[in-house]
Swiss-Prot record:
Residues 1-49, 105-199 are cytoplasmic. It is a multi-pass membrane protein. GO terms for cellular component: endomembrane system; signal peptidase complex. Keywords: Endoplasmic reticulum, Membrane, Transmembrane, Transmembrane helix. This is Signal peptidase complex subunit 2. Component of the signal peptidase complex (SPC) which catalyzes the cleavage of N-terminal signal sequences from nascent proteins as they are translocated into the lumen of the endoplasmic reticulum. Enhances the enzymatic activity of SPC and facilitates the interactions between different components of the translocation site. It is found in: Endoplasmic reticulum membrane. Component of the signal peptidase complex (SPC) composed of a catalytic subunit twr/SEC11 and three accessory subunits Spase12/SPCS1, Spase25/SPCS2 and Spase22-23/SPCS3. The complex induces a local thinning of the ER membrane which is used to measure the length of the signal peptide (SP) h-region of protein substrates. This ensures the selectivity of the complex towards h-regions shorter than 18-20 amino acids. Its main location: endoplasmic reticulum. The chain crosses the membrane at residues 50-72, 82-104. The gene is Spase25. Residues 73-81 are lumenal. One of its GO terms (biological process) is protein targeting to ER.
């Protein structure tokens, strides 16, 4: 492969975002963190429980709406009134559950991975937060032992300018450095805890 091909390949891998769009910046950084966390660590297997729960709730809400529409079509109002009333209540109840799930369970979590070894299983989670009109990107990496429930976390709160250049290009190497720093800190705590327990 020639130099031109290498340059074109590198250019295709670059991610460019509108640096003035906070939502786009956050999602681009989330994708870069997820790629670094899971792509460089084959021992981590991505889990989709949170996403599947959200999709199931959305599917149920849509199914209720479709059922109400179909029932009203075959049984015109006012005969369909009880079914429509039930459907409206069920729809908003499901939306409420979905909101609670997103606010209190997901909490900005965009990556979940399971690490299995001979001794135990550990659940890794990556979450982020970036408030509107704020340039601070808060990244939190946590690990939880599935047996005893002990949870540890490391956080990084830096300006998004630390990971994106003036042209809006996401600097994957700088993102990887930050992710590796948090991951290694948690891994070091994990090793220290295991050595203390063995002593």
């Amino acid at each position: 492969m020639g130099k031109k091909d290498e340059k074109s390949q590198q250019g295709e891998e670059l991610v460019k975002v509108n640096k003035w769009d906070g939502s786009a910046v956050k999602h681009a950084l989330d994708d870069a963190v997820k790629t670094c966390l899971l792509g460089d660590r084959p021992q981590l297997k991505e889990q989709f429980g949170l996403v599947n729960t959200r999709l199931a709730l959305c599917a149920l809400a849509v199914s209720v709406a479709i059922m109400a529409h179909a029932w009203d079509f075959t049984h015109p109002f006012p005969e369909s009134r009880p079914v429509l009333l039930f459907s409206v209540l069920a729809y908003f109840a499901l939306l409420g559950i979905l909101t609670l799930h997103s606010s209190f369970r997901e909490k900005g979590t965009f990556a979940v991975a399971l690490q299995k070894d001979k001794e135990r299983e550990r659940l890794w989670e990556a979450s982020s937060d970036m408030r509107k009109y704020d340039d601070k990107y808060l990244l939190t990496l946590s690990v939880r032992d599935t047996k005893n429930g002990k949870r540890r976390e490391q956080s990084s709160n830096k300006s998004c300018a630390a990971f994106i250049d003036q042209n809006g290009i996401v600097l994957d190497n700088l993102v990887a450095n930050e992710v590796n720093r948090l991951f290694n800190a948690l891994a070091a705590d994990k090793k220290n805890a295991s050595s203390l327990s063995s002593n």
